[in-house]
């Protein structure tokens, strides 16, 4: 077994030959991600030091750990004649999972960071394994990992923060589309497919794309982003809890049974039905926020008074008007930082 200090990811640059790249990619049951199944002798893949059993982390600088087999193959073929693959062997993968480190291209050049190093990324969902309990992701070689949001501190570099933000028509919210290798975003632990929850301590789940961009740019040289990976996002939505900074290191929420609403423990907030209902109960066009019922947030669901019912009916009629499309929304499909 190799010493931990000698373990590192490998960046393999392949130039396509007459018979292709010369390797076979496949998924493994019970493990997240795509793996190198076979490398042909004398092929470009063998020359690039790709090995059977390697797990694929990035393709051409884009993290693919959460993508399907078809999506990964498409990314490999997207650049004609060549491709760049960031991979980890089994020992390195296990070490990264044990230390809860996010695999980055920077590690291929510098090696794994020592403990408590300032540039060490935050824990991520990269560890492969089978799903564990409601509160964790179980790795085949280790204990369950707690599903927590991640707080990423970014300090702007000469080329910006180094990530791309976009919205998805099929689901609400803002998502990290891609992260530039070696960028401030990459070093902070920000990953592709993360969903953005807070910017500089303020929840942005109900904001439009242009408004979120403005909040990120509000502080000139740094930003603090609270994000969740797809698995953590699904877990918190299942509990109907809004992730906050308290969940990064503090107590995690637990489901409450016997018909009681699912509440966040230890000072957090209950996830409002705003994220679960159609647009009639979202923010009005003039920017006024949907008013939360303090009793409902504490787990109580009271019948509305006659005045409240009348006000709700009036608001419903007003909200039936089709909102005007913000020209910024038309112009700015996604933004680079």
From Swiss-Prot:
Keyword annotations of the record: Cell membrane, Membrane, Nucleus, Phosphoprotein, Repeat
Polar residues compositional bias, start-end: 255-275
Subunit annotation: Homodimer, and heterodimer with NHERF1. Binds ADRB2, SLC9A3, P2RY1, P2YR2, SRY, RDX, PDZK1 and LPAR2. Found in a complex with EZR, PODXL and NHERF2. Interacts (via the PDZ domains) with PODXL (via the C-terminal PDZ-binding motif DTHL); interaction is detected in glomerular epithelium cells. Interacts with SGK1 and KCNJ1/ROMK1. Interacts (via the PDZ domains) with SLC26A6.
UniProt membrane topology term: Peripheral membrane protein
A Gene Ontology biological process term: sensory perception of sound
Cellular component aspect of the GO annotation: apical plasma membrane; cytoplasm; endomembrane system; nucleus; plasma membrane; protein-containing complex; stereocilium; stereocilium bundle
Source species: Rattus norvegicus (Rat)
Domain PDZ span(s) in chain numbering: 11-91, 151-231
Record-linked InterPro entries: EBP50_C (IPR015098), NHER (IPR051067), NHERF-1/NHERF-2 (IPR017300), PDZ (IPR001478), PDZ_sf (IPR036034)
Organismal lineage: Eukaryota, Metazoa, Chordata, Craniata, Vertebrata
Name of this chain's protein: Na(+)/H(+) exchange regulatory cofactor NHE-RF2
Pfam families linked: EBP50_C, PDZ
Residue ranges of coiled coil: none
Gene name of the encoded protein: Nherf2
UniProt biased composition (Basic and acidic residues): 135-146, 327-337
Tissue specificity annotation: Glomerular epithelium cell (podocyte) (at protein level). Detected in liver, bile duct, kidney glomerulus and lung.
